């Protein structure tokens, strides 16, 4: 019986044991004790003592429960015992076993089991000390290679795990003091195997190894080598404790025995080091000796032979221990109705047990009975202290009734609904609903109907398929309004009838007209079936006949019958010989009307006429972005007239007019008709062709208009009038630069003399007239316009010439048919030229005026290109080249206006002459390069962006205008001349380089940018001269000359910035004393002044590693102004206060970056009335507004506000009155570092024009201000001022350097000539402050992602 009880107890104990977590709650300390005379505190050297806090609560932990502490990167426990007890007050509450990871796992663990001393009334807590050694590598095994990356020299975080609870502490590990370039050795004892792992790494060869031999062996035979546990490889570097971090295979030969192991290797690449490790078993682990073979040859070096011997000794183990306190809970019965808890007095320094007393009421026992009902009743039988009270509980129970219903679920459910007011409960049973049914009707090939039912599983859908035979079909044919046939099939449901409707177009109709014998007309229509032809027969009575008698030139008579169609009139023409010799001929055309009459005269008249008409029309298909039609018309006429042989009169005119309106479409159809009519006979020729052009546009237009007319009339006894009209057309088409197609036709005029027979009218009579007036007029007018546009197009053309010839004694008509086609490609170009000349009629005007204007424009754009090199190194290159050339030339010659004055000849009244030359050249080249490389396996990314932008522009403008007027004794003399010249030359070059490297393993982020911008702007020779000479009645002479030359030679900005480590400590800058020199020379009351000033801002040496950045600015500006006036005055001073905000703007490519500093200024000015002839000199300039963000300066207080924003500039104009008094101050309250005081140097200077410069560099602000005081009144014929300014700013910071020294230099030279001396003072200030490195880092990273 006792044995059975014992077995049952053991079974219940093991059955209820469980795994618990959260027992270890902290790492209280982690300290190192030198157990083997080690040279440094390395993580792998014993012993590291970890003190951990623990707590066991008997209410949640039971005997037999287990818990585990995992210790990553721990190599072994260095204790002599195999386990440690968790003890409190001398009582063991749990036992923990040591499991060292060694070469087996990357972690060690502590597995604990709760023993029987822990009861539910006990809560024990305490600490345990664990002696350990960490694993930071030491062999080529996978476990050691992984743990070789656990820690680095310096501060590390050690983390242990108890279930989901992590215990961490910070600890400092020292780096190995052994030189990594020499040979490296390590030995570690593995208690579980009772063996030692020995490592040997060959000395370092930076360029690699040509060959070598390495190994180790026992010196006295007391060490056995395990050849089954050997690792050989090459490692790419070692960690901070000289252990391999990688292992790769290479070429070697191995020799191994129980006495020694060695390898011979060849050709090890640079950056790798060979190593060998093996397990050894010394006879005494605390003391043994090994001999090492060390022969090697580095690349490009000599053979090295350096064997050595090492004696190894062991270390002293540390013991694990535990201590803690016990909390005991006791229970006492009281008469209270509730339970109370109290703690007895406890002194932690003396007592080892903490007692908690639980006060409980009298215990009770409960008896439960049941009955059919609704409510529960309670009754209590009391008892004194020491006995047990009884509580009787009468619990009701209910009977049930079952209800079954259907639901949408897939299973059957049973739910009991308790009735709170009755003793009968309801049991609801829900069964799934039956599946829904879907009926589908289909056609099939059988002639009968079939039904099939398909039943699916629960929650599915059952299907009923009804199969019906196909419906019969009825076909109907109909006529419809379309020109094509179509068939429509109407399918009905089963048991219906399908319909096929065939729609046919209406039959064509043929109409036939016939004569018949009746006197009335009738129409008969014959209609056929579809696809036939309907007939309409019209029957007409015969036509009436009209007989006409005419004269003709033959000597015999003839009869001609002309029969026409129905409803017409037939004609009978009788031709009789001519009896009179007079005629009239009328010829009409759409272009001209020529009539002539003549009779015998002593004059011989030659008359020729040729009429050529050309008309063209085009119909173009519509498109979404082009006009829908095109029309072109060309008319040309030429006429010449000769009055008689003895008169000096001739007239010749030629007029050509072109109008064009076309659409840009893919098809153009042209139809052109030519006709020719000559008075010698009746001949008509019709030529028709069509062309199709698939193009964007292609046109060539030439318009020529010339007119030469001379006329002179003299008295003659007999008069005659002859008009000759000649029409000539020349059509020239230039389709493209590749295809030139010229089509020309020339129709010579026929010559008619008096000996020819002319047609005359019966009533025609000769006409004669005479004239006695004489007039002479010469008019010459010429206008030439040429326009050529050849965009890219494809040209297709086809032509046809139709001929149908029929002949009769009086007419000949012919049509000729031909066709051709061709296509070509048209290249783009554009040119425009215009010229005109004018000569006015004698005797009112002489000489001539010619005007010439030409304009050309060419443009070329290079297509972008893109290239890719590899998957991990992509190179994208974008290139764009745009060349634009535009030139305008104008030539104008002199025109002389004359008027006749009493017959004395021509008097010159005006000789205006003007010349305008303008030339503009623009050359823009844009090159952008983007290089991206990435290596996803190592989580390193590198991005480089090297855009390059070069832009240059040259423009020149010259204008000259003069007017001269010369008159006789009455007209006054006025002379005006004006000359202005403007030229400018702009050049801008920009180069930006951005690089970024990110390494996710080490957490390093490097971002940098380099920007170079060079600008050259030159604006010179702005000169304007005006002179006015009045007549003799006025004596005032006014002249003014101004010559302003401004030249900005070059501006170069180079910025390079690399961001590495944040530095929030401010630096203090000192200012070197300023120096200036003045040179005064006096020559004929002319005083010259030269001022040179240099201000240098230096920084004190810094030793912290901050940001690598540099900024250099070079700017040279020169301006010269010369002003001549009759009188000049300045303004004296009066008190006033103003506030000035200085802004400096730098632009690159298509964006502008602005920075601004706020300067407080005080000024005073007083107005003095100027003489009536004085002129106020005003300076107009543009400002740009900027808004931005204010960045706080960590570590210093500075009221300087820096603003930056990429925004388009807004132009505004302000007017500055000459000679205000300006005093500028700059406040800087930056706090200085210890022993580095700040210095500020102030300089004040007053010159003719106020000037202020604000240079904002990368993290530095340098401000120089100038002030001006009023000048005395100056009366001078001229004032010349020349100002040259050069700014060089360079700011460099280098993480490897120990200091940085920015320098700012401003030089200014002013020269003035005046009658009275100037009042000159000097004032200025300069200061600088350094922004913390975090701001530079933020800006650089933001700039990188922005670009």
Swiss-Prot record:
Main location: membrane
GO BP: adhesion of symbiont to host; cell adhesion; cell adhesion involved in multi-species biofilm formation; cell adhesion involved in single-species biofilm formation; cell-cell adhesion; cell-matrix adhesion; hyphal growth; single-species biofilm formation on inanimate substrate
Result when mutating residue 1202 to N: In allele ALS5-2
GO MF term (any one): peptide binding
One Pfam family this sequence matches: Candida_ALS
Induction of synthesis: Highly expressed in biofilms and during candidiasis infection dissemination.
Keywords per UniProt: Cell adhesion, Cell membrane, Cell wall, Disulfide bond, Glycoprotein, GPI-anchor, Lipoprotein, Membrane, Repeat, Secreted, Signal, Virulence
Domain of life assignment: Eukaryota
Family: Belongs to the ALS family.
Function (record text): Cell surface adhesion protein which mediates both yeast-to-host tissue adherence and yeast aggregation. Plays an important role in the pathogenesis of C.albicans infections. Forms amyloid structures, essential for cell-cell association and cell-substrate adhesion to polystyrene.
Protein name listed in UniProt: Agglutinin-like protein 5
Organism per entry: Candida albicans (strain SC5314 / ATCC MYA-2876) (Yeast)
